[in-house]
Curated annotation (Swiss-Prot):
This is Chaperone protein ClpB. Residues 6-71 are annotated as: Repeat 1. GO terms for molecular function: ATP binding; ATP hydrolysis activity. InterPro entries: AAA+_ATPase (IPR003593), ATPase_AAA_core (IPR003959), Chaperonin_ClpB (IPR017730), Clp_ATPase_C (IPR019489), Clp_N_dom_sf (IPR036628), Clp_R_dom (IPR004176), ClpA/B (IPR001270), ClpA/B_CS1 (IPR018368). Belongs to the ClpA/ClpB family. It is found in: Cytoplasm. Keywords: ATP-binding, Chaperone, Coiled coil, Cytoplasm, Nucleotide-binding, Repeat, Stress response. One of its GO terms (cellular component) is cytoplasm. The Clp repeat (R) domain probably functions as a substrate-discriminating domain, recruiting aggregated proteins to the ClpB hexamer and/or stabilizing bound proteins. The NBD2 domain is responsible for oligomerization, whereas the NBD1 domain stabilizes the hexamer probably in an ATP-dependent manner. The movement of the coiled-coil domain is essential for ClpB ability to rescue proteins from an aggregated state, probably by pulling apart large aggregated proteins, which are bound between the coiled-coils motifs of adjacent ClpB subunits in the functional hexamer. It comes from Clostridium acetobutylicum (strain ATCC 824 / DSM 792 / JCM 1419 / IAM 19013 / LMG 5710 / NBRC 13948 / NRRL B-527 / VKM B-1787 / 2291 / W).
Amino acid sequence: MDVDKLTLKVQQAINDCQTIAVRYNHQQIDTIHLFMAIISQEDGLIPNILGKMGADVETVKRDTEAELDRMPKVLGEGAQNASIYATRRFEEVFVRGEKISRDFKDLYISVEHVMLALMDIDSGAIKSILDKNNISKKEFLKALREVRGNQRVDTSDPEGTYDALNKYGRDLVKDAKKHKLDPVIGRDEEIRRVIRILSRRTKNNPVLIGEPGVGKTAIVEGLAERIVRGDVPEGLKNKIIFSLDMGSLVAGAKYRGEFEERLKAVLKEVERSEGKIILFIDEIHTIVGAGKTEGAMDAGNIIKPMLARGELHCIGATTFDEYRKYIEKDKALERRFQKVQIDEPTVDDAISILRGLKERFEIHHGVRIHDNAIVAAAKLSDRYITGRFLPDKAIDLIDEAGAMVRMEIDSMPTELDMLKRKIFQMEIEKEALSKESDKFSRERLESIQKELSDLKDKDKAMTAKYDKEKAQIQGIKELKTKLDEIRGQIEKAEREYDLNKAAELKYGEVPKLEHEIEEKENLIKQNGQNAMLKEEVTEEQVSNIVSKWTGIPVSKLVEGERNKLMRLSDELEKRVVGQTEAVKSVADAVIRARAGLKDMSKPIGSFIFLGPTGVGKTELAKTLARVMFDSEDNIIRIDMSEYMEKYSVSRLIGSPPGYVGYEEGGQLTEAVRRKPYSVILFDEIEKAHSDVFNIFLQIFDDGRLTDNKGNTIDFKNSIIIMTSNIGSEHLLNNKGVSNVDEETKDKVMNELKGRFKPEFLNRLDDIIMFKPLSINEIGKIIDIFLENIKSKLKEKNIKIDIAEEAKKIIAEEGYDPVYGARPLKRYIENTIETHIAKMFISGEISEGDILKIEGSDSKLTIVKK
């Protein structure tokens, strides 16, 4: 027996024979061991053929195992050291197999030759197993021809090339017949263009090019559905569309040339079909370079000749970037394909697509999807989710909203969960009290037993209600699944012209199921507001998902948020004292945006805050972030003093290709991409280079900016605040007046125009001038600073009282109109905080003490009460 003439699978089977013999304690390898080895091979040819014959491979295995168990076993110490020998019959199988191989005109002995040899030689155990499972040689040869076709075994691994299309692809037309594909709505123009190209004599290979998620694969599925319905020209009727899986084609190809063998086998099957099979390669750019090793051809070069001759009907799908990067580089491959550009559908088209898919999602999740949820998904995803494309992002929204509602149905309602926890807690308390004998414990035990009895009754009633509602929802899901299956059967019956069956299902089963579904839905509606479970996906759920994805609040305003927005000005003024005009402008911009009345193409607001140092410009931005987001973390702060050089603009949007930091992205663009709903503070803008401001023009006008990788960053949900000290000397001369007078405003504006270009200033929503703080306002700021000290000391359980005289001294000693409120803060830190800290460290004061801050002769004194 020449081992080189055996295929890899036969060599593997011989090795497996020895393992099987050792496992069953047999001293010799016989034909039954070989039979067991070849029917146990994973993805093997013999199990595949037996399956095609209708035999149960697992039953055959069990019968073979029983036969192996009956064979004589050799046990003991001597048996372990003894060698395992092959019987004469075992050798005869390969001699016979070689003859069968020659009859088949094959170059190697393959597993099918071995199987046929086993059928001829073993008339005992193997014959009885085959007879028992109705496996005859004649039927085996018939199934073998189906799988093998006219192929010869001319390689050591022929099994990888048998039935190649079914192994490495998926029949989309078959899936469409089985009602497995999602319905394709619209896209008629694109499908017609694909049909037109497929109908050509040569170069009949369309390639669908479009952004990810616009529905390229769906168009091919739509074509498969049209072929099933017969809604195609005569030349495409009864064609098969096979979706080729490049991953499984490459996977497991260990040896050189194995990948090419598999691909050639696929192409041979397509060629033999004489145009009946259309190959669909999703992500077609993967064929360029696939299987490429030193001196070998890649998949792209293997299919080129067939594409040019028109022997291979192929549909490709890829994105613009990948097409440019891989296909366009290879001009010979590019000219063999005809481009079909797939554009993103409009919002209205996306709504139609979602309406078509609605029923599938309802069946999958077992929920009811309202039409307003579908409209909201299309509109909100288009407006707020950037960087992705319709209809994919809208479908994802509906899918996740459905999953969220389903999860709530499957989880125990909060009310019932809390009740069960309370019962559990009281049961533990009851057990503990039952061991006590005092009067109080007995009284408490009686009270608990009574309360526990009531709670258990309530739990019983609520659990029954929950189970009933859940069963109703599950019942609807099952009925809808059944209805969908029946509709698939109707389509099949109509295709096969079985009109009696179609009519029976259409006018008998369908109305009956629809009536049952309606009855169950009415039962759920009767629960109304008292229902424990909600099985509806509404606009609210979709809005919540958008908010979770983007961080932008798009859900309907709840009462708490309404009050918060209406009190926004007051909340801001608690921290930013004396700047009413600035606070009002910012608050109004936020309210307009939240009500949905802002300009959709611009940021929520873009402001320049002008004024002397220490009057609250930066503080207003921080306070706005704190009030709106409950944290200052959502403020994106960029200190413009770091952008004094012309080239430093690249730090905002990212370095150009080839420069250090290209992969890291820009400080501004990356921050906004992660948190699109935020306050962006550009501090001290007059310090930056004038060219840096050119990138702001697009942000202010269109609410967008393109980063170094070509990604569009959306600023439409940001508040942009810039602070500057330009013209502060003019504003300082305005002190004591409640508002900035017109003359001062003109002087400041003239200075501002001298520093910034008109196109920059013209795009701003508002230029707000902060006036210097008056003595009255200083008093309020002192209160804010002192309140901070009180809150710090409260943690240490120390209280402080501050006399009015002390506040006057702080104002006189700490306030400087030129420097604003910052010197006040420093004065309070140096005099009050430092003094209290020293008293605490030295042990003069301890927890529970009350301190009194008094003032006299321009000095502060701190005494313990």
